[in-house]
UniProtKB/Swiss-Prot annotation:
Its EC number is 7.1.1.-. InterPro entries: 4Fe4S_Fe-S-bd, 4Fe4S_Fe_S_CS, NADH_quinone_OxRdtase_chainI. GO terms for biological process: aerobic respiration. [4Fe-4S] cluster 2 binds at C61, C90, C93, C96. Pfam families: Fer4_7. This is NADH-quinone oxidoreductase subunit I 1. It is found in: Cell inner membrane. [4Fe-4S] cluster 1 binds at C51, C54, C57, C100. It is a peripheral membrane protein. Keywords: 4Fe-4S, Cell inner membrane, Cell membrane, Iron, Iron-sulfur, Membrane, Metal-binding, NAD, Quinone, Repeat, Translocase, Ubiquinone. It catalyses: a quinone + NADH + 5 H(+)(in) = a quinol + NAD(+) + 4 H(+)(out). The keyword Glycoprotein does not apply. It comes from Rhodopseudomonas palustris (strain HaA2). The lineage of its organism: Bacteria, Pseudomonadati, Pseudomonadota, Alphaproteobacteria, Hyphomicrobiales. Binds 2 [4Fe-4S] clusters per subunit.
Length: 171
């Protein structure tokens, strides 16, 4: 009988203490600045997509959830013909963001990715591409790399050092 009263007193004391539970849809959780959530593809300041389909993100992905294929535009610029991420397999490690040389792929703090069907977690390029520049502002990859200058050989462009003669370095 005494054990029962002790239990009721313990429950009664906790009855008036503020609950620690957050009511999720009404109260959004506080995320850390470096939290990793939904993956997006960004555009450069000119409005063109930054991705050059180098396949580094797919190569570094530990679970292999990124699939893309390269196409070449009329001006010689590479772009992904299709870009697909399977969020059912993604572990949000951030390796793809670190490996991207153009800052095209970025992880946002958006974590609400719940779906009823598993195939709805496969995002295509049009689902991933956003209108803005994302976290890296003002970066134009194609202004510093990737395009040949007509009439100039390697090392002849402005701010470019001539190529190193590797055979001349041999003993």
């Amino acid at each position: 009988m005494i054990g029962w009263l002790e239990a009721m007193l313990r429950v009664g004391r906790k009855l008036f203490v503020k609950a620690e539970t957050q009511l999720y849809p009404e109260e959004k959780p506080k995320l850390f600045p470096r939290s990793r959530g939904r993956i997006v593809l960004t555009r450069d300041p000119d409005g063109q997509e930054r991705c050059v389909a180098c396949n580094l993100c797919a190569a570094v992905c530990p679970v292999g959830c990124i699939d893309l294929s390269k196409a070449v535009a009329d001006d010689g610029r590479w772009y992904p013909e299709h870009f697909r991420i399977n969020f059912a397999r993604c572990i949000f490690c951030g390796f793809c963001e670190e490996a991207c040389p153009t800052a095209a792929i970025q992880l946002t703090p958006d974590f609400e990715l719940g779906e009823w069907r598993r195939d709805a977690l496969v995002y295509e390029k049009h689902d991933l591409l956003i209108a803005g520049e994302g976290k890296v502002r003002g970066y134009r990859y194609w202004s510093v790399a990737g395009k040949a200058i007509d009439g100039k050989d390697k090392g002849c462009a402005e701010n470019e050092s001539p190529p190193v003669d590797l055979k001349g370095l041999l003993p």
